[in-house]
């Protein structure tokens, strides 16, 4: 579960390395974000020459969480890190590559580009 002040790694090549969650989108009382949810983040560290610069406020979709995610078939999935992919306002990716595995739940949330570029879908 991702909430305000959570730090996430960036799983794409947009130039950012670390994000800080500012807001979970989807309602005024929404506290937690899980896999497939869109959050508003601040870029805390970035590589020089990248598309995204340090201090920028961006939207991102959560692709991996440390907390367990329950699926409809009763199985659970969790990862070793919290990670997100930076997106534009129209749900298009800023980067052109995805690093690390992503979950099948992104397919249900219409993030097909992320699923197709990921090296592994769990």
Swiss-Prot record:
Keywords in alphabetical order: Ribonucleoprotein, Ribosomal protein, RNA-binding, rRNA-binding
Gene3D superfamilies listed in its UniProt record: Ribosomal protein L14
Keyword Acetylation: no
One GO location term (cellular component): cytosolic large ribosomal subunit
Cited SMART domains: Ribosomal_L14
One Pfam family cited in the UniProt record for this chain: Ribosomal_L14
Biological-process GO terms, alphabetical: translation
General function of this protein: Binds to 23S rRNA. Forms part of two intersubunit bridges in the 70S ribosome.
Entry-linked HAMAP family: Ribosomal_uL14
Summary of subunit composition and partner proteins: Part of the 50S ribosomal subunit. Forms a cluster with proteins L3 and L19. In the 70S ribosome, L14 and L19 interact and together make contacts with the 16S rRNA in bridges B5 and B8.
Name assigned to this protein: Large ribosomal subunit protein uL14
Species this protein is from: Alkaliphilus metalliredigens (strain QYMF)
């Amino acid at each position: 579960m991702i909430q305000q002040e959570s730090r996430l790694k960036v799983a794409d090549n947009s130039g950012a390395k670390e994000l800080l969650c500012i807001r979970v989108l989807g309602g005024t009382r929404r506290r937690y974000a899980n896999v497939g949810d869109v959050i508003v983040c601040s870029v805390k560290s970035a590589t020089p020459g990248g598309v995204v610069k340090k201090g920028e406020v961006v939207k991102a979709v959560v692709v991996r969480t440390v907390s367990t995610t329950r699926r409809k078939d009763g199985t659970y999935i969790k990862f070793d890190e919290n990670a997100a992919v930076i997106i534009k306002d129209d749900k298009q990716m800023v980067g052109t590559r995805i690093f690390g595995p992503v979950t099948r739940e992104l397919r249900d949330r219409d993030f097909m580009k992320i699923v197709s570029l990921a090296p592994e879908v769990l």
